[in-house]
Amino acid sequence: MDQYCILGRIGEGAHGIVFKAKHVETGEIVALKKVALRRLEDGIPNQALREIKALQEIEDSQYVVQLKAVFPHGAGFVLAFEFMLSDLAEVVRHAQRPLAPAQVKSYLQMLLKGVAFCHANNIVHRDLKPANLLISASGQLKIADFGLARVFSPDGGRLYTHQVATRWYRAPELLYGARQYDQGVDLWAVGCIMGELLNGSPLFPGENDIEQLCCVLRILGTPSPRVWPEITELPDYNKISFKEQAPVPLEEVLPDASHQALDLLGQFLLYPPRQRIAASQALLHQYFFTAPLPAHPSELPIPQRPGGPTPKAHPGPPHVHDFHVDRPLEESLLNPELIRPFIPEG
């Protein structure tokens, strides 16, 4: 840590605190995520390990936040990321009204390019939401927080937990307890994010899992085996029943959105996961090629995080770890292959 000067605190996540820092020799500004180990014998938290591995698999995309270095520190380790000025949640929060159509197109296009790159490399993010889409000082959107990401098994035989994704962006199959799923969970989240950008507020703001399903059903209608044959195989399908609800036309939900925008949105928000439009296909949709065209990143709003140079922390878990410990990190805790030295650019 001696090579960095801490400039302020950005926020707190599930496994550590994120700081804004400057490299002493190069002057480069970075974001340092300090990950503490509660007990040395527990080893590296799975989420932190997944984030490292996923980012090393897809480090060549300009639409994914770059992991610059990983190094041990005290009873834990530190991830050094490129510094990003804000996030899409702040953009939506600061907007006085829904974003302009050209701005929505630009953000969505950058998001889809990042998602397409991840999926092409068999990475499923599993927690796409505006707060995990960071914005650089130049307006570039990049996907961050790969703590829930997994390498996708194309044969579909692998079981995963359904307790992933932030509730408002959680796909219906996850709400019904699916243990086998694929990139479709990310595509549903993209649709939720697109709807939020068009609407200026979340499409499905449920306060618990049951209410979340109700929010979805109110707009998309009650799912049936006729529309979604696989629903009967989901673990929680028979645990709760809903009265028949007809879908509400998306043009009534988002009356100011264009026909092309609603057509693309509808292809994300489909009950059968395999029928959702792929990110690579979505980038070819007519929506992106009709006026107004996507805005240049320099034309996009870039709000500062609250607090200016010392941004307000995002809500985190009640426990706060002490990172200022002098105990050496046992070699067995950290795979040496995951440790990369800081290499200054240029």
Swiss-Prot record:
InterPro entries the record matches: CDK (IPR050108), CDK20-like_STKc (IPR048002), Kinase-like_dom_sf (IPR011009), Prot_kinase_dom (IPR000719), Protein_kinase_ATP_BS (IPR017441), Ser/Thr_kinase_AS (IPR008271)
Reactions this protein catalyses: L-seryl-[protein] + ATP = O-phospho-L-seryl-[protein] + ADP + H(+); L-threonyl-[protein] + ATP = O-phospho-L-threonyl-[protein] + ADP + H(+)
Keyword Nucleotide-binding assigned: yes
Coarse class of the protein's main subcellular location: nucleus
Example GO BP: embryonic camera-type eye development
Keyword list, A-Z: ATP-binding, Cell cycle, Cell division, Cell projection, Cilium, Cytoplasm, Developmental protein, Kinase, Nucleotide-binding, Nucleus, Serine/threonine-protein kinase, Transferase
Residues that hold ATP according to the record: I10, G11, E12, G13, A14, H15, G16, I17, V18, K33
Active site (UniProt): D127 (proton acceptor)
Chain spans, region Disordered: 298-324
Top-level enzyme category: transferase
GO cellular component terms attached to this protein's record: cilium; cytoplasm; nucleus
The Protein kinase domain, residue ranges: 4-288
Locations listed in the record: Nucleus; Cytoplasm; Cell projection, Cilium
Assigned EC number: 2.7.11.22
GO molecular function: ATP binding; cyclin-dependent protein serine/threonine kinase activity; protein serine kinase activity; protein serine/threonine kinase activity
Superkingdom field: Eukaryota
CDD domains xref list: STKc_CCRK
Quaternary organization: Monomer. Interacts with TBC1D32 and MAK.
Annotated function: Required for high-level Shh responses in the developing neural tube. Together with TBC1D32, controls the structure of the primary cilium by coordinating assembly of the ciliary membrane and axoneme, allowing GLI2 to be properly activated in response to SHH signaling. Involved in cell growth. Activates CDK2, a kinase involved in the control of the cell cycle, by phosphorylating residue 'Thr-160'.
Protein name: Cyclin-dependent kinase 20
Source organism (scientific name): Rattus norvegicus
